[in-house]
């Protein structure tokens, strides 16, 4: 079967490494934390992220990035968006042949407003680029790793890469569709994190189902507006990489973005909430990026604007809700 390196030892990278191993592939994980590497090699666990799960014993781990980079020609990039450019640049300096990069990050770069596939493309030389794709959709790691039925989308500018992703990951509990709209799938995965934080705030404040439904619906509308302006197919946002990912992230306590929002809605400061969670919350960085990107593109994104004021200007959550509800009359 196929050899694959998984860069990143977070919850989703670990869950997908387990899928790949169970599908018969040879998997090497890379991470910087020596304790996590040792724990995985010795005990087949990653307790920090997937506390009670015993992983496939065939998964190995290393902290040596050169070993990881030269293990195979296929990489699963399971890193936070803010770490992607640095790690892919380092990988590029260590390899001498084409590699296929599959990423699962859901974010937008702060300074450049680039999607993750664009960041990877920037970071590697042309003669090392064997194709770049994304695997995205409603897929909590905690459910994937215990084989709960899950359905996701694989996308790339190169259809061969989309089909490769489908072939590598698909099994009887993980169904993978291909989708040729890379822009839409990446934007859907990133932008829904903004709405998920807002959804958590609404829940934390004690508002009911009406408010939650309105937030998700109007959130999808502003995601679609920006996506279409950036070249995405609006129909993509009605699929797994759009509304599918939006629903699961806006309604589940598995979601870091929702959990952060919930804590903010209950009155915690962002520092207090993040200290309790001790995990990367992509929605914070994405809100910052998209707030400025929307202004640059002249796209109306009222929920994003309101959340930006909460996260970065210390606007009270009650005032932000009042501002949203008090906007001028308009047609849907």
UniProtKB/Swiss-Prot annotation:
SUPFAM superfamilies: 6-phosphogluconate dehydrogenase C-terminal domain-like, NAD(P)-binding Rossmann-fold domains. One of its GO terms (molecular function) is NAD binding. GO terms for cellular component: cytosol. Keywords: Cytoplasm, Lipid biosynthesis, Lipid metabolism, NAD, NADP, Nucleotide-binding, Oxidoreductase, Phospholipid biosynthesis, Phospholipid metabolism. Pathway: Membrane lipid metabolism; glycerophospholipid metabolism. Pfam families: NAD_Gly3P_dh_C, NAD_Gly3P_dh_N. InterPro entries: 6-PGluconate_DH-like_C_sf, 6PGD_dom2, G3P_DH_NAD-dep, G3P_DH_NAD-dep_C, G3P_DH_NAD-dep_N, NAD(P)-bd_dom_sf. The keyword Cytoplasm applies. It catalyses: sn-glycerol 3-phosphate + NAD(+) = dihydroxyacetone phosphate + NADH + H(+); sn-glycerol 3-phosphate + NADP(+) = dihydroxyacetone phosphate + NADPH + H(+). NADPH binds at residues 11-12, 32, 106, 141, 256, 280, 282. Its EC number is 1.1.1.94. The active site is at residue 192. Sn-glycerol 3-phosphate binds at residues 106, 137, 139, 192, 245, 255-257. The keyword Lipid biosynthesis applies. GO terms for biological process: carbohydrate metabolic process; glycerol-3-phosphate biosynthetic process; glycerol-3-phosphate catabolic process; glycerophospholipid metabolic process; phospholipid biosynthetic process. It is found in: Cytoplasm. PANTHER family: GLYCEROL-3-PHOSPHATE DEHYDROGENASE, GLYCEROL-3-PHOSPHATE DEHYDROGENASE [NAD(+)] 2, CHLOROPLASTIC. Catalyzes the reduction of the glycolytic intermediate dihydroxyacetone phosphate (DHAP) to sn-glycerol 3-phosphate (G3P), the key precursor for phospholipid synthesis. Belongs to the NAD-dependent glycerol-3-phosphate dehydrogenase family. This is Glycerol-3-phosphate dehydrogenase [NAD(P)+]. It comes from Staphylococcus haemolyticus (strain JCSC1435). The gene is gpsA.
